[in-house]
Amino acid sequence: TDQTVDTKTMTVDTYGSVQIPWTGEDIKHVNNGSGFETIYGDQIRQAMRSITNAIELAIWTAAYKGSSRGHGTAGTTPFASSFAELPQLRKILQDNGCPFDGQVSVVMDTTASANLRTLAQLQKANEAGGTELLRQGTMLDLMGLMLKESAQITTHTKGTGTSYQLSAAGSVGDTTINVDTGSGTLLAGDIITVAGTSHKYVANTALSGGVFTIGSPGLRAAEADNDAITIGNNYTPNVAFHRSAIELGIRAPAMPPGGDAAVDMMTV
């Protein structure tokens, strides 16, 4: 039978490098103390951390701005008294058709993970099923979700938009949202609610020409023309996703056609 296979365009649009310049005199000086090999090794490790952090930040930004829906209260860190948010995240993923095959993760900021680590039921071996969290600080899987943390997660600052309304009725599954009457900005990553429903949609694109998009599978309920649009407050985007939801393309920097001035090169 005829098939239509969706395709996506992957663009390498971010470039990073770390320079570690040394002269012979520099090496001679440090060899009187800690030694060049020790310092240079630390510099290599720090360079790798710097690049890894940049990659982590880029992936997280793409993840939350490309999400479908949100859960929770802006400005309130989850897991203060329980992990009740996790089954709600799982429900959203299940409703979206996400497979639960051991490859679904929740990546949270360090404040949320600190809250999670203080929950008594996760510290008690007889309730948690192990002592890894109490002794090593290792977060265990919960609700079929692998729990991870990242220091690169920061606050999303919402757009300034107010008083927007739908300029046309919306059907279940619509991802393109048309609005009018309002003013101000609506940014990618903003949390959007529509009057009459409790769903919290994530804007995947900024408002432009009266149009913005939300993540698939789109609207969960039919909406009427002139329904009010509300932009949620600033928030910290912890993200839940399947491994296949995010793709990362990395390559070594392109070599000039005539080569460069390097006398030695190593790819790790």
Each model region followed by its residue ranges:
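N-terminal "assembly arms/tails" that initiate or stabilize quaternary assembly
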Residues: 1-13
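Short intrinsically disordered coil segments
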Residues: 2-5, 121-126, 164, 265-268
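Long, contiguous amphipathic alpha-helices that act as assembly "spine/axial" helices in icosahedral shell
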Residues: 10-85, 94-112, 137-147
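Short linear interaction motifs
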Residues: 85-88, 175
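Glycine-rich, charged/polar anion/phosphate-binding loops
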Residues: 90-93, 132-134
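Autoprocessing Asn-cyclization modules and mimics
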Residues: 115, 120-228, 232-233
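Glycine- and charge-enriched low-complexity intrinsically disordered segments
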Residues: 213-267
